[in-house]
Amino acid sequence: MSMLFYTLITAFLIGVQAEPYTDSNVPEGDSVPEAHWTKLQHSLDTALRRARSAPTAPIAARVTGQTRNITVDPRLFKKRRLHSPRVLFSTQPPPTSSDTLDLDFQAHGTIPFNRTHRSKRSSTHPVFHMGEFSVCDSVSVWVGDKTTATDIKGKEVTVLAEVNINNSVFRQYFFETKCRASNPVESGCRGIDSKHWNSYCTTTHTFVKALTTDEKQAAWRFIRIDTACVCVLSRKATRRG
């Protein structure tokens, strides 16, 4: 604040020295009229009041290992390039039914941040017909307590668990999918010929845009989350006799 004050004073003094005064306006040798200084003081007071009342940039502060919720402009969520079907901001937990998780969850108190053509996502691999099974078993849940994550540069960042939007606290949820077990059956992946193949199930990742903070600067960043369970195969070495 003091820096702004000194800057305004300096700018004015430079302007006073550079202003071409006429004889009829300010006679040579006379000081600047008191009314002029009064006008200057009024201008400075107005500038300082505006500086004090101007909203500061949102900075997240860490308290006991957690991050305080920060105020976010709701217009920020209208940028389509930031949309992800796996990220949700809500004042209440998303539905967690055993059959499906509705990604178009639009109950009161939810930011329509994740609109997508995929209206529903299964929380577990479904069995469509009798006798059909998944090679790997997975489970999908909304994660609302994520505090840290790895960004696309491989750097660990702090995830903003909560943000303040229009004086309401919204929690940031991530829809994550991971493997139930690395070996659904004793030999590895289900349905794989273990005589010729080694196999195991593993969780894969993708990057989504999320609100994070790093070195007290809040910003959108790509972070890595679990998104699928796949089977990894490797051919067994054959002995040549």
UniProtKB/Swiss-Prot annotation:
GO CC terms, sorted: endoplasmic reticulum lumen; endosome lumen; extracellular region; extracellular space
Tissue expression profile of the protein: Detected in submaxillary gland (at protein level). Highly expressed in male submaxillary gland. Levels are much lower in female submaxillary gland.
Signal peptide: 1-18
Annotated glycan sites: N69, N114
Top-rank taxon, per record: Eukaryota
UniProt entry tagged with the keyword Ligase: no
Binding-site residues, a 1-acyl-sn-glycero-3-phospho-L-serine: R171, K209
Covalent S-S links between cysteines: C136-C201, C179-C229, C189-C231
InterPro entries: Cystine-knot_cytokine, Nerve_growth_factor-like, Nerve_growth_factor-rel, Nerve_growth_factor_bsu, Nerve_growth_factor_bsu_mml, Nerve_growth_factor_CS
UniProt-annotated location(s): Secreted; Endosome lumen
Propeptide: 19-121
Annotated binding of a 1-acyl-sn-glycero-3-phospho-(1D-myo-inositol), by residue: R171, Y173, K209
GO MF, one annotated term: nerve growth factor receptor binding
GO biological process, one term: extrinsic apoptotic signaling pathway via death domain receptors
Presence of keyword Protein biosynthesis: no
Keywords: Cleavage on pair of basic residues, Disulfide bond, Endosome, Glycoprotein, Growth factor, Lipid-binding, Metalloenzyme inhibitor, Metalloprotease inhibitor, Protease inhibitor, Secreted, Signal
Inducing stimuli: Expression oscillates in a circadian manner in the suprachiasmatic nucleus (SCN) of the brain.
PANTHER family the UniProt entry points to: BETA-NERVE GROWTH FACTOR (PTHR11589:SF10), NERVE GROWTH FACTOR NGF -RELATED (PTHR11589)
Similarity comment: family membership: Belongs to the NGF-beta family.
Quaternary structure (record): Homodimer. The homodimer interacts with a single NTRK1 chain. The homodimer interacts with a single NGFR chain. The NGF dimer interacts with a single SORCS2 chain (via extracellular domain). The NGF precursor (proNGF) binds to a receptor complex formed by SORT1 and NGFR, which leads to NGF endocytosis. Both mature NGF and the immature NGF precursor (proNGF) interact with SORCS2 and with the heterodimer formed by SORCS2 and NGFR (via extracellular domains). The NGF precursor (proNGF) has much higher affinity for SORCS2 than mature NGF.
Function as written in the Swiss-Prot or TrEMBL entry: Nerve growth factor is important for the development and maintenance of the sympathetic and sensory nervous systems. Extracellular ligand for the NTRK1 and NGFR receptors, activates cellular signaling cascades to regulate neuronal proliferation, differentiation and survival. The immature NGF precursor (proNGF) functions as a ligand for the heterodimeric receptor formed by SORCS2 and NGFR, and activates cellular signaling cascades that lead to inactivation of RAC1 and/or RAC2, reorganization of the actin cytoskeleton and neuronal growth cone collapse.
Protein's name according to its UniProt entry: Beta-nerve growth factor
Protein's organism: Mus musculus (Mouse)
Recorded name of the encoding gene: Ngf
